A protein has these predicted regions:
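Sequence-level detector for compositionally biased, low-complexity segments
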Residues: 505-514, 523-524, 542-1007
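Short, basic/polar, glycine-containing "phosphate-handling" surface segments that engage DNA
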Residues: 2-16, 64-65, 75-215, 219, ...
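Metal-dependent nuclease catalytic cores in nucleic-acid-processing enzymes
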Residues: 31-36, 85-105, 430-437, 530-543
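Conserved catalytic cores of phosphodiester-cleaving nucleases, focusing on short active-site segments
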Residues: 30, 60-62, 68-76
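Short acidic loop-to-beta-strand element that houses the catalytic metal-binding Asp/Glu
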Residues: 54-64, 612
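Charged, often low-complexity linker/regulatory segments
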Residues: 1-40, 44-52, 223, 238-240, ...
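SAM-dependent methyltransferase catalytic region
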Residues: 47-52, 293-299, 303, 307, ...
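Preference for the N-terminal adenyl/adenosyl cofactor-binding alpha/beta module
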Residues: 153-386, 417-422, 454-460, 490-503
Length: 1007
């Protein structure tokens, strides 16, 4: 064996001595070495360059017969394996059971994504001298370790996180392999393509190959997990056994798992699935879940959540965190679900005179059940499961009737729609098991569970009969049955937690036509009504409009209850419903929400967006006028909110009837008693003639940088290299689904250094941007052209008055809020030299009447001071949330000059032009590398790493907000892993002065 290693090292060293040798140049030598090592193991063969054969695989596969037992990924000699370990490629490969990472000299071992054994080096290299030095003592150690490692795979999984990591890795492999398979034409792909085309035609019209690969992989992997979770024979597990665990409640699921367990299942995927089954056979899934979820997410005194559901979210985090966020896959806490279910039950009894509430089995004159229930975004079936529990509680003394009741009175009217195949799978299994525990186990073709795989927001229409009885036909049947629910059932109750996806992909004609009712008469340039949750509310409202009575009860994003662009939506809901109940659960960390007493307010979900429970009631009979709105709210920590919800329903909550008014129809209490006085002032958008929102890049990683030279080199490289969009996405870490119009960049012939200019990215954070419309989504040149390479100054504020700042260069649309507007003080003539005030002449003349000897800058300073007044912001807070701020005219010249002088101080501070910066008040006492590692604040010190800190930093400066940002914190956090220059260290200390002085001047303004 020693001879084999010596020949290998000798050949490797010879090739390494030549700089032009690439990673591929060592492959043949390495394959010979592997064959020598495994020569003594019967039936083993080495597959070289597995990527080219099957795609998305490590470079070498060691097989025993046809079964892979070891995967090896090889990198070039001298490459940092530490960095490779953290790469996206390795994240995918960690789904392999036995994996080795090597640079041909060092070997690292991973079992199911976890490091295994210590690395072994058979040689060391000197990159500078291009030499290789043997480590002879490790030859035998590598042989033994590789053979033992390949043979032994049956180790128990000891933690839920480890299992989630393995499942995520396997799912990524399946997803990536399917994408690879379907990217080329092959007879082997016929069945996969058939399934894809059927789903696209009947379920998801805009389905891409990438999304299909994701759906397929998730359903397969997580479906196996759920089957294993309910496996009563824990010592073994296989695809065939998983098939036996699938209930007869849904032919679609049965066909899917029959497809997986069958002999014709794609062999290129089968070995991955079998690997996962092998892992499951050595994992006590129920025990792991029991350990993993001993503490639930909302306090130990409550009933814990379903571990299967919470594990699914952890699986998504490992599999694709971006997908979890995008799809809004958040488990609805049980107290929320129970509150909604109890409230609906109460309303059915009280308002609709149905004595059995949700359990009521009465029928219409057409013989159809009256209380038809739908969860249009059912997810994993949490709401339907709770409804089932709630109804079953009424049968405690009538257990003998239960099976017959379920068969004839419950299943025909309990419906759920779900687009994602994995949650859909979980919902079916979970509901089936829940029913089994109550004593109902008999399903047949006529009485299946009414949970369907469909896109609620798509109108697929009635489907023709299909005579085939295979997997594809079962998908068609699923679509047909879902279409019947949408078009024929008189849905009376709609419940749920619809997804929150601002960048919605649901853009079908049917739902967009319905949403038009929410946009009538709106004149905003940007109407933010495309979030999925709004579409689901409109979808639910549509059913009640058709039925002419019913209830919608959902927990959603709460932006619609007081958003300005949501005013027509609120009016339309008032036209449809008789009573609307809004239980605001707050929890909006974006708005820095706190309890009325100043204590912490938390969200019931792990998200930043606030939420509310909304219950819309349309009573039977003719609708007259607009409906009534009742409001209540719960502040506090999550546990407090859950405790309140747990013991309440609509009947016990204390509601306040709102006196809403046009044109806004707010669903929250508002105090507009100061309206007459407020309206006497002028709106900033009336004072400034020209203004716009800031620049939209869509690709900050490309167009913006801290360093002018770095940005210059990057832009030149992009222009010269003409990368493909996919190369740009990989190279600059762009969103995979970016809508950036990169093709415009490809038209640029020459780099223009003059287009690199300072850019106000965030408050006190000026960077550099390549200001070229081809690189930007929206350049806003009409307004930003007044700043580009020109001397100007501009007010920065927003429509909801949450911040005010000043800027003297072009700026970002997210400068200090979601939509930051810029108001230039001056505009330039066509010659680009002569400037004139960008002010409304009539308003400016009013100021001249009060104080004759003033200029445009003085008016700006006066406004600036007023917008920093605590008293002003508190007094007019409700008005400031609606539109651009209005500023009162001064009573006299004395008041004007006092405020203008204070505003001038603020302006100079915020532009870093104040004399206050001549003397620093903070310290920076410790020397070091100046790298920002971990930012923390303690005892008036702002640490940037373990050793170095800024001293004497006042707490008021550290916590000071400008819009949605805390500049003293964000400026440093945005520079994590960067080494601060001397100028940056000084600049940060000036930020602290500016913030502390701003607080002082704000108090002066209100004196």
């Amino acid at each position: 064996m020693k001879d084999i290693f010596e020949k290998y090292i000798q050949s490797i060293a010879s090739k390494f001595s030549h700089e032009e040798t690439s990673e591929m140049g060592y492959r043949t030598d390495f394959e010979i070495l592997l064959k020598g090592i495994f020569e003594s193991v019967k039936g083993v063969r080495i597959l070289h360059d597995a990527k080219s054969v099957q795609g998305n695989k490590p470079d070498f596969v060691v097989l025993s017969g046809d079964v892979p037992i070891l995967y090896i990924e090889a990198k070039d000699i001298g490459v940092s394996l530490d960095k490779i370990e953290k790469s996206e490629q390795m994240a995918r490969y960690y789904g392999y059971t036995n994996l080795v990472l090597t640079d041909y000299l060092e070997f690292r071992f991973y079992r199911n994504g976890i490091k295994y054994e210590e690395p072994i080096k058979i040689a060391n290299c000197n990159i500078k001298n291009r030499t290789v030095e043997c480590a002879v003592d490790n030859y035998d150690h590598l042989i033994k370790t590789l053979i033992d490692f390949a043979r032994s795979q049956k180790e128990p999984i000891k933690s839920g996180k480890h299992l989630a990591k393995i499942m995520g890795g396997k799912a990524r492999r399946i997803r990536d392999n399917i994408k690879q398979f379907l990217s080329i034409e092959s007879e082997k792909n016929t069945e996969l393509f058939r399934v894809y085309e059927t789903i696209k035609k009947l379920l998801v019209h805009d389905l891409t190959l990438e999304t299909f690969a994701d759906m397929y992989a998730q359903t397969l992997v997580y479906g196996l997990f759920v089957a294993r979770y309910y496996d009563e024979t824990p010592k073994d597990f296989s695809r065939q056994e998983a098939l036996e665990r699938i209930p007869a409640s849904n032919p679609f699921l049965g066909h899917f798992f029959y497809h997986i367990a069958g002999r014709d299942f794609d062999r290129r995927l089968a070995y991955i699935v079998d690997e996962l089954c092998e892992v499951f056979s050595h994992a006590d899934v129920q025990e792991l879940m029991g350990q993993y979820f001993k503490k639930d997410l909302w306090g130990e005194t409550h009933e814990g959540p379903d571990p299967v559901i919470h594990f699914y979210e952890d699986f998504l985090n490992e599999y694709d965190p971006f997908l979890r966020k995008k799809m809004g896959a958040y488990y609805t806490p049980l107290p929320v679900v129970k509150f909604i279910v109890r409230s609906v039950d109460y309303l059915l009894e009280k308002e609709f005179k149905l004595p059995f509430g949700l359990a009521d089995a009465s029928k219409t004159t057409d013989g159809i059940h009256k209380v038809q229930i739908l969860d249009p975004a059912t997810g994993t079936g949490t709401f339907l499961t709770e409804i089932l529990d709630h109804i079953y509680a009424r049968f405690t003394a009538q257990g003998g009737r239960w099976p017959a009741y379920v068969h004839s009175e419950l299943l025909p009217r309990l419906h759920g729609f779900e687009l994602m195949m994995a949650p859909y799978t979980i919902a079916h299994l979970k509901l089936t098991i829940k029913l089994a525990k109550t004593g109902f186990t008999i399903f047949n073709r006529g009485k299946r569970l009414g949970v369907y795989l469909t896109n609620s927001l798509e109108d697929i229409g009635r489907q023709p009969e299909l005579l085939a009885f295979d997997f594809a036909a079962s998908i068609a049947e699923e679509a047909k049955e879902a279409s019947k629910i949408k078009n024929e059932k008189p849905i009376m109750v709609v419940v749920g937690n619809p997804p929150y996806s601002i960048s919605s992909s649901n853009k079908g004609d049917w739902i967009l036509n319905l949403i038009k009712d929410y946009k009538k008469g709106l004149n905003e340039r940007k109407i933010n009504l495309d979030d999925d949750y709004i579409k689901f509310i409109r979808f639910a409202e549509h059913f009640i409009e058709k039925n002419k009575s019913g209830i919608v009860a959902m927990i959603t994003n709460n932006s619609f209850i007081d958003g300005i662009t949501h005013r027509q939506m609120r009016k339309h809901l008032l036209e449809t419903f008789d009573e609307i109940y809004i239980l605001d659960l707050h929890g909006n960390s974006k708005k820095k929400e706190k309890c009325p007493d100043g204590s912490k307010d938390e969200n019931v979900f792990n998200i930043m967006q606030g939420v509310s429970i909304s219950i819309f009631v349309r009573k039977e009979g003719n609708k007259k006028g607009l409906g009534k709105v009742f409001h209540s709210e719960i502040y506090g920590k999550r546990e407090i909110k859950f405790e309140t919800l747990d013991k309440s329903d609509l009947k016990t909550i204390k509601w306040k009837k709102l006196d809403y008014s046009e044109p806004y129809y707010f669903f929250v209490p508002k105090d507009f008693s100061q309206k007459e006085e407020y309206d006497k002032g002028f709106k900033v958008s009336e004072l400034f003639i020209k203004y716009s929102v800031g620049i939209k890049t869509k690709v900050d990683n490309v167009s913006i940088n801290f360093d002018r030279n770095v940005l210059s080199e990057r832009i030149q490289n992009i222009i010269e290299s003409k990368y493909s969009l996919q190369q740009m996405i990989a190279k600059f870490d762009l969103a995979k689904n970016t809508t950036w119009e990169y093709e415009k960049v490809l038209t640029i012939k020459d780099f223009d250094d003059k287009k690199i200019t300072p850019y106000d990215y965030r408050p006190f954070d000026t960077r550099f941007i390549y200001y070229d419309n081809n690189f930007l989504s929206r350049s806003r040149s009409d307004v930003m052209g007044e700043f580009f390479q020109k001397d100007n100054i501009g007010l920065e504020t927003s429509r909801n008055g949450d911040y005010t700042f000043i800027s003297n260069t072009i700026s970002d649309e997210h400068f200090a809020s979601d939509n930051s507007f810029k108001f230039p003080l001056y505009t330039y003539e066509y010659d680009g030299v002569k400037q004139k005030p960008n002010l409304n002449g009539e308003i400016f003349r009013r100021f001249l009447e009060i104080e004759p000897k003033i200029e445009a800058i003085d008016v700006l300073d006066y406004i600036y001071a007023f917008l920093y007044s605590f008293k002003y912001k508190e007094k007019y807070k409700e008005f400031l949330k609606i539109d651009f701020p209005r500023v009162p005219y001064p009573d006299d010249g004395k008041e004007f000059n006092r405020l203008a002088n204070l505003g001038a101080e603020l302006r100079k501070l915020h532009l870093m032009e104040s004399d206050k910066f001549n003397k620093l008040v903070t310290t920076y006492p410790e020397s070091g590398n100046n790298e920002v590692e971990k930012v923390r604040y303690k005892d008036n010190k702002v640490f940037i790493n373990e050793k170095q800190y800024f001293g004497r930093v006042p707490e008021i400066a550290w916590n000071f907000y400008i819009g949605g940002y805390q500049p003293a914190q964000k400026w440093l956090k945005d520079r994590k892993s960067r080494k601060l220059t001397n100028n940056e260290i000084e600049h940060y200390q000036k930020i602290i002065i500016a913030l502390a002085e701003t607080d002082r001047i704000m108090k002066e303004i209100d004196k």
